[in-house]
Amino acid sequence: SQKSITNAVNVGTATITVEGLGTYYSGEASGTFTITPAKVEDVKVTADAKTYTGKKIKPTSFKATLNGNDVTDQFKLSAYGDNTNAGKTAGSLTIALLSGNKNFTGSTVDGTFEIKARKVASSTISVYDKYGQMVNDKYDTATVAAANLKTFTYDGKAQTFASAKLNVGNVVLETGESADTNIAKPTADDFELVYVDNVYGKSTQGATYNTAHVYAVAKEGGNYTGTKTITTADGTVIKNVVADLTFGISALKFVKENVTVKNGVYAGGVAVKPEVIVQFGGNT
């Protein structure tokens, strides 16, 4: 049976010793065998995830494994990539064998690591009329008293403001800090504006109008991400919401001028139902 193996960890010559067992076998014998270098490209490199800063990120540590065994102490960090944008494998690094290492053939191996999008806790949205005037103080249901609130009127079409924008200067990160000089300031291109429930609106208990929304949403795969998820009236789920402006849509009131009744034709003694047409602004 095997008694011992010596010098069998690193590249070189190792010795194995076996001994006899039982009544008819006694003594021991030794032999040698050679351990050859592994290929450095078979080493897997991982590094801890980092969070987007807008600046070049240097990995602070890494782990190198060969067949699941830790060989980190045989390597050093030799280079790293631009590492400025967020992504699952957006970060890159290169490790090199320490001087004099004979356990591997080759010299360097590359790896990747995740750069996480930075979370935005909140911001604000400004909306404007066709004259370029900000009208939050007329339409925003969160800040305008019901008696003074101006609403859109239902007409069967999607209701939108002349323009809307996310106030990137008001972005607050999940950590509670603003996007200051330590973090690349977000731009409007990092987000998109989405109107939701803006045809009929969504019924709101106690309100005389239905509610619709303009949401600012962090773009998928970008450097920022939202912390809120909302569900629309039709069940659509929207993730990564960073800001919301709620506005009202009032029911349409019509008068007799909006209604046309066509004459009916005798139906043989049963009640005749005339055709009734209701029109608003050319829409039936």
Segments the model singles out, each with a brief description of its role:
Residues 32-69, 114-179, 250-283:
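Solvent-exposed, low-complexity, repeat-rich "mucin-like" stalks and linkers
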Residues 30, 110, 243-244, 250:
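Non-catalytic terminal and connector segments of soluble metabolic enzymes
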Residues 1-26, 67-113, 172-233, 238, ...:
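Serine/threonine-rich, repeat-prone extracellular segments and beta-strand-based repeat modules
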Residues 29, 145, 220:
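Short, flexible active-site-proximal loops enriched in glycine and acidic residues
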